Amino acid sequence: MQRIPLWLVRSTHCLILLFQDDVQVRKSCLEPFLFLSPERKREIHQLLVAFNQSLVTPTQDEEKILSDIQRACLQIAEDLKHLNPFTGLLLDLNLYTLWTLLRNYKTKQRSQPVNSTVVSRYAHHVVKYIMQRLVYTTDRLFLTAPTSGIVLPVPLANAIFNLLSHCRKKCTGLWRNYGTEKSVLMGLGKEITLCYQALNESGIVSTTLAAFIKLSFPTISIPNLFKPMFQSCKGNQDNFPDICTQGSVIRRPHQGVFGDTFPIPDPLMREISENSFKKFSTANISTLLQNPKEILEMDPFDPRIGGFPLNKEETATPLKDSSFSNPTFINTGAANTLLPAASVTPALESLFSPTHFPCMSDESIASTSHVPLDNNISLPTLVKTNFPLKRKRQSRNIDPNTPRRPRGRPKGSKTKKRPTCSPALFQSSDIPTDSLHVKCPEMLPTVPQNEFCDSSNIQPCTSSSVLENDNLVPINEAETDDNILATILQDLYDLPAPPVLCSHENQTLEIDNNVDIEDLGLSFPMSLQDFLNDE
């Protein structure tokens, strides 16, 4: 029996994958979605199947697929509208799961026109944007809570911190990690909502805390998110400049280049088109929380708190919806409402700073100040204008035979040697300059061995009297640690040579009253009482 070559088997398998109609979308991939109805999950499954079919047959209307995805995102936002105050957080998590599925199923296709569609090109950028948006909102929550006088319960703070740690870990690793561990991330989001519900039922959560969480997690602007994609369908060129690497050649992301580094978050750069992130004029937002009950009753998609109208007919005259005031999952009725009721509706917009241009120079602001920010300006164009690529360095004509310039300090340079410690530092401050060349002190104190060491037993002796006394026995310098230490200090600090140490055996010398402390070369008092009197 003749064996089939292995290369032929692999080639046949690749051809089967290349010409197959679509990749089977498993229904188990819809399990990570949070608080969505079964009907909504079935619509998402049909959308994924249609998206895979569009990757194989790109002749299909590309704008129709994009409109279906936008409609699905708006329907997800409508289903999460009643989950007050975590509507913004849960919307980000569910949109992250949806766009991660679009990105992952795009990578599974082996057909040639996979990356030619708009959704496949933008999928990874949307996933990255939502992930860094989660990092931005959670960081802002932990920073503004203590400055605003908000005390987060310990279980809720730990749950939010676990979500922040997971998101930051995904941002600092390889770009492939964005499409992994969807279930882990959605489980952390579900843990936050369940923890908040348990604390709210116990009466621990106040209305101020609930309003603060609602302001900390604004809803994402879905129309502005899809605006560059629709412009790309109409023929506009996509520009995705790399902000992290400002070199002439864009490096490929790998662990050695982008490991343990965090790039500039996209929410800081895309604020011009993404209006859900309104800059607070101060870190203390306690003024916004004067009437927290009114903030909780506001629509989470209200433009005053960074939202957007879900329906197009509500753009001109937004109507107040009463469905959000009675949430079905998270109830804030048991919250403490003993707070001053001051109306903050007229001053709500004034507490936010005006339009902010992050990371822009004065020249860029001056050049773009007269240009109206209309809806025709695409997001990549704004990013490319505000963050131009680094100018390439001009090549220099250097002769390869020319020796290279040596690095470091050249020989014979006039650099001063670091001064060493001189004996003048041990002299008194009132000694004249002419006396600083003294080689050794005139008097040294000695203490008898059979008496206590106090100020009355200190016996000074001169160098001349020590040599004239016949009863003095010299000590071997090689056998004492003091002489060894004195020699080391002399070498290190360029000190004068110490005098010969001698011991007194059964000799009682009278105290010389003529000895002055300045003769010893010391500037500090000799006894504790003198030290106290000096102080």
From Swiss-Prot:
Basic residues bias (residue ranges): 404-419
GO biological process: regulation of DNA-templated transcription
Molecular function in Gene Ontology: DNA binding
Sequence intervals crossing the membrane: none
Region of interest: Disordered: 384-426
Entries under InterPro entries matching the protein: Herpes_TAF50 (IPR004998)
Entry keyword set: Activator, DNA-binding, Early protein, Transcription, Transcription regulation
Family named by the database record: Belongs to the herpesviridae TAF50 family.
Protein function: Transcription activation. Regulates the delayed-early 110 kDa promoter.
Protein name: Putative transcription activator BRLF1 homolog
Organism: Saimiriine herpesvirus 2 (strain 11) (SaHV-2)
UniProt gene name: 50
